[in-house]
């Protein structure tokens, strides 16, 4: 954990999924406030167009192009989200390994460094002990994030089913309350505040981007907090 090397006991990290073009705007905001994020990509879906329908709104869900991955995510971390975004709990061992390890290898080639992180794809029950053990024992992945939020900032022992804290602006009240609590927290042991989401969700409501920036302004540039990618914070 890099923040321990800097004699800091608190760390904040972000994780955003799917590799959509809204990530570009998100990264501009992250950089403005000195924040770091891990972006979880599906290598076989890169470059593909897409539209989501949300409350009669058409929301862009265009994936970034493979050739742009390296420079778009420069300064942050790229991680595995599987080749094609299946629910891994429904697959056999061979297909789980293929979905994870081939995505990891393709992304590593795109970014020019070894990809070691992951976030489980699909909503609902998208991971279990069987899947986690297969990934741990058969791939180069060293940690993987779930979508099960926890109230605790304590460091977790199981990095292959690592639980985040809050689903960004879609849980705005919780996001701000946890942010304020983390800033004021005094601790002698490592504490991690982990936020996750999808950047295309910022387009669901006209004020979501401004709400996210307000949160960034609240938590950013604190001397006693380490801001790092998932790998920098967890490994």
Language-model features: where?
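Active-site metal-binding loops of divalent metal-dependent hydrolases
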Residues: 16-19, 82, 199, 230
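A Trp-anchored, charged/polar loop motif used as the substrate-binding/catalytic surface
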Residues: 20, 169-185
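C-terminal domain-boundary segment and adjacent tail
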Residues: 1-6, 32-34, 43, 108-109, ...
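Distinct, well-ordered alpha-helical segments
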Residues: 26, 129-134
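Boundary/entry segment of secreted carbohydrate-active catalytic domains
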Residues: 1-22
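Metal-dependent polysaccharide deacetylase catalytic core of the NodB/CE4 family, i.e.
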Residues: 31-129, 140, 147-161, 166, ...
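Non-membrane alpha-helical structural segments and their capping/turn regions in soluble enzymes
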Residues: 93-98, 172-176, 206-209, 213
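Hydrophobic "anchor" residues on beta-strands that sit immediately upstream
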Residues: 13-14, 77, 225
